[in-house]
Amino acid sequence: MFLHSTESGWIAETPAKINLFFEVLGKRNDHFHEIVSVALPIRFFDTISFERTDEPLIQFQCIGGGEDVPMDETNLVVRAAKLIQQRFNVHHGASITLTKRIPSQAGLGGGSSDAAAALRLACRTWNLDVPDADLLPIAAELGSDCPIFFHDTPTISAGRGEQIQPLPATPPLWFVLLKPPEGLSTADVYAECMPLHDGQYRQPVTLLAALSNGDVQTIGEHLFNRLEVPAQKLWHRFGKLKNQLLQAGCLAVQMSGSGTAFFGLCRDEFHAGEILDRLTMQYPQSSFSLLEKFCSLSPHF
């Protein structure tokens, strides 16, 4: 995420992520699922602004995002700000504006990314010197994948997602991202995920090696998402949308997280632009709520 100060407060650009690898190892005693995930942040952002107020109230407004974005205290951004208030005995408030671009029910982590940024923004707005190490457990309370957004590089996660190891920065990777209007319930997708036997689990070893040196072909050959199987059972258009990206020329296509966004891996920016133009000409704009090309969040770009 990118944070900078303004005359009246702080602003953050909060990135989306895609899951290059997602394995479900089973259900835990706490009803969460044990997972292994490799997530890659991409240059596709929501924007959040915080302004300090004297009264200890959290004022929140959201621009964009549609009906799926909570506008009340259940929004993760508001919950994050209130947690900082409570944990650090803050007597000031904040006026918060969230500008949503990352769609909901997409598997792109927009809400979690916003929540992670809100924790950092609240600390800066209220002049709290809180290291990220102390914010990470709070982030995990808000959502299993919130902690990954404290890193601007790929991450590998385990446990229910809270055990995170940052990976080295990658060369730029280009994708075409497609999000249909419909969404899937994460709970429903996990409920349809059948338990596996020992030895059936996939490991991201080859993918991680390819990711470190930007070997696009090998990355494409080793993309994996266990949640595609239950998603396909619940959603009749799954195969059709995936094939649209493949037929347009993507090297490989995968659903991100629990869906319903798909990303198509491309050789480079020019290739991504060609595929985007092809899809734009073939299908009416109303077919998708999002169709765009994006690059990974990389210091090399």
What are the language-model segments listed below?
Residues 1-106, 124, 128-133, 170, ...:
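ATP-binding N-lobe of GHMP and related small-molecule kinases
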Residues 2-4, 41, 140-141, 147-150, ...:
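Solvent-exposed alpha-helices and their adjacent loops that cap or buttress functional pockets
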Residues 56-65, 70, 118, 140, ...:
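Short, basic/glycine-rich phosphate-binding loops at helix/coil junctions
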Residues 67, 132-151, 275-294:
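Short, conserved aromatic-histidine micro-motifs
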Residues 97-126, 144, 250-266:
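Glycine/serine-rich anion-binding loops at beta->alpha junctions
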